[in-house]
């Protein structure tokens, strides 16, 4: 093939015409020290706080310490291949996560990347993990209940939409079980649930996901998992990522329930990062801003006023105590930030009282306004009965000769305690809770043997569902026990008691 000189020159001219000069400008620094998941980087003068930095091999880091001559950066991923002298690029992005409906039903890591093997998540929208909490003007007070399906909680420490209610207790007292039950009970309630697992074993998280799938709860849930094997920065980041995902739904007028399981491990991860970054330690070696770590997260839970969309985020943070010590640093911090706490006791748990809620130490500071009237009608008496029972039970240990009134109170208290027991993954709709508690506080269980209370409860609920559904419907729709409903309910209890032996 022979090319004439003029053809060659025309081909070269075409190539010159097509040529586009492209200059890629990137701010590049140099690693001067690396180790323990922390890198010191020199030369990135315009770097922002919490900006993502790109290390060789695609590993990402987050700038936390902006010092005079270098940047302290935490590495979010494997760092053994990073060495002194490596280039580090600025991305210009503050750390953000994907948000939207595409995440529902998925298990993701704190960066929003799927870890459930179900393929990529198709969403265009991203949100920064950090956001300033809604102000006073944009909020509305808590008035709508968020039913957990657990009698002891919905009756005595009620949770409202937009509330922060702490679940606190030692290890192995059923904290996660309470949270998972609350998620399962949101089926059909139009609530998006987000379960954030911080520092849990991968097998534990897999168990929770299987439970949610088995009860059809993954259809409206997102699981954000930072397992125990992950680097500390990912454990620190996970709650903020979950909250950012929830805020997308809240801003679109939806109700969201977020479980942070648990914030003790997030505080530990933050302590590890801070000490490695050489920040000065404070009490229990935590950095001085560990209170702000949790307050800025939990303040993002809110109920928005209708003109701002009317959505809500309800937060159930979990804190693990050591030997029931509620006065340690992190527990006292989170108790002071939240609107109440559900305290779970080891002794109650071991004695078979499940959920192991300590009625004396548990409180809901705003949820009472959100309780439906029917529950208020029966639960007011319930708290009083239990308080008197605890007082008398302590007193009765010293003397055997008790008068009839005291004996009757002790008997009723024992039955009330029994009626508040509930199996795992068996949440009750609120109207069924009301009728069951009604039987206890109105004295209908006084002549039922203590060991038959559970059987009575199961039988009575089935009887009400099949034969007296109109009473349950009336309580559900009217949200109170009107005199005519009351009379029907008493008649129904009497009718069932005749058949129960």
Curated annotation (Swiss-Prot):
It comes from Desulforamulus reducens (strain ATCC BAA-1160 / DSM 100696 / MI-1) (Desulfotomaculum reducens). F-type ATPases have 2 components, CF(1) - the catalytic core - and CF(0) - the membrane proton channel. CF(1) has five subunits: alpha(3), beta(3), gamma(1), delta(1), epsilon(1). CF(0) has three main subunits: a(1), b(2) and c(9-12). The alpha and beta chains form an alternating ring which encloses part of the gamma chain. CF(1) is attached to CF(0) by a central stalk formed by the gamma and epsilon chains, while a peripheral stalk is formed by the delta and b chains. The gene is atpA. Disulfide bonds: none annotated. It is an enzyme of class 7 (translocase). GO terms for molecular function: ADP binding; ATP binding; proton-transporting ATP synthase activity, rotational mechanism. This is ATP synthase subunit alpha. ATP binds at residues 169-176. HAMAP family: ATP_synth_alpha_bact. It is a peripheral membrane protein. Pfam families: ATP-synt_ab (PF00006), ATP-synt_ab_C (PF00306), ATP-synt_ab_N (PF02874). It is found in: Cell membrane. PANTHER family: ATP SYNTHASE SUBUNIT ALPHA, MITOCHONDRIAL. Keywords: ATP synthesis, ATP-binding, Cell membrane, CF(1), Hydrogen ion transport, Ion transport, Membrane, Nucleotide-binding, Translocase, Transport.
């Amino acid at each position: 093939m022979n090319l004439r000189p003029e053809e060659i020159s025309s081909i070269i001219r075409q190539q010159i015409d097509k040529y586009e000069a492209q200059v890629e400008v990137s701010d590049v620094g140099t690693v001067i020290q690396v180790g323990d998941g922390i890198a010191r980087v020199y030369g990135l003068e315009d770097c922002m706080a919490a900006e993502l930095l790109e290390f060789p091999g695609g590993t990402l880091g987050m700038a936390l310490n902006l010092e005079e001559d270098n940047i302290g950066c935490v590495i979010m991923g494997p760092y053994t291949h990073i060495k002194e002298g490596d280039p580090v690029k600025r991305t210009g992005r503050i750390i953000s996560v994907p948000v939207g409906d595409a995440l529902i039903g998925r298990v993701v890591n704190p960066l929003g990347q799927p870890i459930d093997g179900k393929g990529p998540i198709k969403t265009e929208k991203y949100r920064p993990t950090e956001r300033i909490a809604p102000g006073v003007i944009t909020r509305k007070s808590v008035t709508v209940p968020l039913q957990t399906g657990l009698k002891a909680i919905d009756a005595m420490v009620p949770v409202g939409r937009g509330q922060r209610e702490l679940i606190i207790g030692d290890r192995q007292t059923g904290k996660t079980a309470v949270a998972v039950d609350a998620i399962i009970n949101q089926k059909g309630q139009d609530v998006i649930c987000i379960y954030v697992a911080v520092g849990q074993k991968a097998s534990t998280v897999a168990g929770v996901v299987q439970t949610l799938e088995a009860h059809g709860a993954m259809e409206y849930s997102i699981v954000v998992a930072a397992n125990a094997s992950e680097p500390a920065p990912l454990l620190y980041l996970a709650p903020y990522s979950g909250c950012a995902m929830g805020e997308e739904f809240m801003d679109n007028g939806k109700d969201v329930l977020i479980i942070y399981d648990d914030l003790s491990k997030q505080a530990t991860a933050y302590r590890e990062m801070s000490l490695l970054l050489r920040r000065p330690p404070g009490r229990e070696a935590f950095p001085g801003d560990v209170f702000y770590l949790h307050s800025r997260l939990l303040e993002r839970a809110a109920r928005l006023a209708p003109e701002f969309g009317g959505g809500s985020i309800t937060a159930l943070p979990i804190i693990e105590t050591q030997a029931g010590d509620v006065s340690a640093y992190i527990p006292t911090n989170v108790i002071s930030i939240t609107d109440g706490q559900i305290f779970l006791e080891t002794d109650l748990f071991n004695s078979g009282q499940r959920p192991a809620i300590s009625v004396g130490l548990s409180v809901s500071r705003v949820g009472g306004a959100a309780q439906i009237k029917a529950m208020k009608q029966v639960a007011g008496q319930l708290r009083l009965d239990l308080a008197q029972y605890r007082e008398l039970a302590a007193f009765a240990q010293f003397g055997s000769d008790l008068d009839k009134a005291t004996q009757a109170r002790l008997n009723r208290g024992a039955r009330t305690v029994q009626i508040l027991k509930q199996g795992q993954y068996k949440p009750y709709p609120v109207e069924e809770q009301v009728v069951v508690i009604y039987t206890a506080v109105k004295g209908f269980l006084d002549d039922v043997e203590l060991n038959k209370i559970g059987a009575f409860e199961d039988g009575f609920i089935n009887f009400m569902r099949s034969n007296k559904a109109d009473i349950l419907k009336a309580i559900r729709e009217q949200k109170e026990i009107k005199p005519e409903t009351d009379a029907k309910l008493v008649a129904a209890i009497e009718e069932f008691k005749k058949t129960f032996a």
